[in-house]
Amino acid sequence: AKVTAVSSSTPATPSRVQVVLDFARAQIGKPYEFGKAGPTSYDCSGLTLKAFAQVKVSLPHQSLAQSKLGSAVDWKSSAIQAGDLVFTFSSLNMSQISHVGIAISSTQWIEAPYTGGVVRISALPSASKIQAVRRFL
């Protein structure tokens, strides 16, 4: 029997991860501002909070609090996936989570980095600098 492909004019619904990443990518170039969650400036947890709000996942506006939610990912033995939240230490206090970004692959993330910086895509921190990885989607 001959199989014919059925084409549809309706585009596929983007995955929840794609919705989060598309929102985060749209913020690239906007300035970092402590305590802000958009629409014109963000701090690190404000960016993750707003991106995940697009898929009805509610996150607190603090990286340490966000790091206690979702499912833990063992980043040393399994790959970080797009949509995972990646948490790092402060350079000032090596025992305190103080930064978060959204992985877009196993090697890159989107982050609102620091005062004077802008939302950007950059290389994921090395495994030794990562303190937690959490999966929400």
PLM features: residue spans?
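Intrinsically disordered, low-complexity
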Residues: A1-P31, S78, P125-L137
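Residue-level signature of the cytosolic catalytic core of signaling kinases
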Residues: T13-R16, K36, T40, N93, ...
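Aromatic- and glycine-rich peptidoglycan recognition patches
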Residues: T10, V73-S77, M94-L137
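Generic alpha-helical structural context detector
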Residues: D22, L49-A53, E111, Q131
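Catalytic cysteine-centered active-site loop
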Residues: K30-A82
